[in-house]
Amino acid sequence: MRKRRRQPSLAQLRAFAAVAEHLHFRDAAAAIGMSQPALSGAVSALEESLGVTLLERTTRKVLLSPAGERLAARAKSVLAEVGALVEEADALQAPFTGVLRLGVIPTVAPYVLPTVLRLVHDRYPRLDLQVHEEQTASLLDGLTGGRLDLLLLAVPLGVPGVVELPLFDEDFVLVTPLEHGLGGREGIPRKALRELNLLLLDEGHCLRDQALDICREAGSAGVAATTTAAGLSTLVQLVAGGLGVTLLPHTAVQVETTRSGRLLTGRFADPAPGRRIALAMRTGAARAAEYEELAAALREAMRDLPVRIVRD
């Protein structure tokens, strides 16, 4: 007779999914708020329950076994479905209550989050908003995998199973050192970008990709930047130090340029290069009506920002 296996617990699946994502016990434990011994024990218990080896452990690294490779996606799917179940139950209780896990890209978070947080505090006091700042690829993985509920980021995404709720459009502004010839000018033609030493964010930031697209549209063969930065604050200081120029979203200009007296901003001729910011949710999300209402409220709250509100 075939031995009856014990059913794996959600904690075991969550531990395995975290290790499969990070391939590192310490990072995986930190990601889900579990101690390393507890994480290791949960994965071992899952292996015993399933009767297969999921991980190949060495003194230097952790790898997924062939069985682990196959079952990691299934574990992620199960956790996403459980998350959707809890989400739907929360939505049935009362709108705008319970936990809302919001993912935000780094080039939006410092400049737009204050408006979001004020709105939630004033209008939705029973909503437990949890903010996660990550790059776009990580946010999308979190949304589709059920780790996050809603995203605030640049679009279009073009991702199946993800619905975009546009909020606003904003222009990019050229930031230069004081002595630069384009500093403070209005009506700068895009073709001027062909001759500029444009400083960019590191790989993985969507703002970097947008800047490269703008350069290509202007007729530049591409930017071979030898200097990059992990954040806009560092990027602006590099400009102030005379290493080049950069593009900033208009919402970031006041925060990032007032710290240095050695910067000027220039505006592009219409139509200026820019980006669209939106909320993004899973197709068929149980709380879709709430998210749409939140998007409408955010559009009204963001009228004082230097942006153009997108009416749904």
Curated annotation (Swiss-Prot):
Task: Please verify whether the record's keywords include DNA-binding.
Answer: yes
Claim: Membrane is one of the keywords in the record? no
Report the InterPro entries cross-referenced here. LysR_subst-bd, Tscrpt_reg_HTH_LysR, WH-like_DNA-bd_sf, WH_DNA-bd_sf
Provide the HTH lysR-type domain boundaries: 8-65
According to the record, the signal peptide region is none
Keyword list (alphabetical) reads: Activator, DNA-binding, Transcription, Transcription regulation
An example Gene Ontology cellular component term from the record?
protein-DNA complex
Q: Name one Pfam family in it.
A: HTH_1
Q: Name one GO molecular function term.
A: DNA-binding transcription factor activity
User: What ranges are recorded for DNA binding?
Assistant: 25-44
| Record family assignment | Belongs to the LysR transcriptional regulatory family.
Query: What gene name does this entry carry?
Result: oxyR
Source taxonomy: Bacteria, Bacillati, Actinomycetota, Actinomycetes, Kitasatosporales
**Protein's recorded name:** Probable hydrogen peroxide-inducible genes activator
Biological function: Required for the induction of a regulon of hydrogen peroxide inducible genes such as catalase and glutathione-reductase.
